[in-house]
Amino acid sequence: MIVRKYIYGDFNTDEAVEWAIKNCPSFEKYMIVELGWEEKQEIDCWFRFDVYFNDEKDATFYSLMWI
């Protein structure tokens, strides 16, 4: 299961990953993805933060905290 967040302003990805590691046993990995040019223009954002979990409950818990 993937939780996606567009990165705006001062969102702290390091803190978000540390929280996932400590609180979500099924945390698998994370990726910071640079958006394509059209998507950048459409939503005025350059990067997306993807966090991967093996369990839907952890993904939901993480979403409630960070999204």
Predicted regions and their residues:
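Structured alpha/beta or helical-core interaction and ligand-binding surfaces enriched in interleaved
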Residues: 1-46
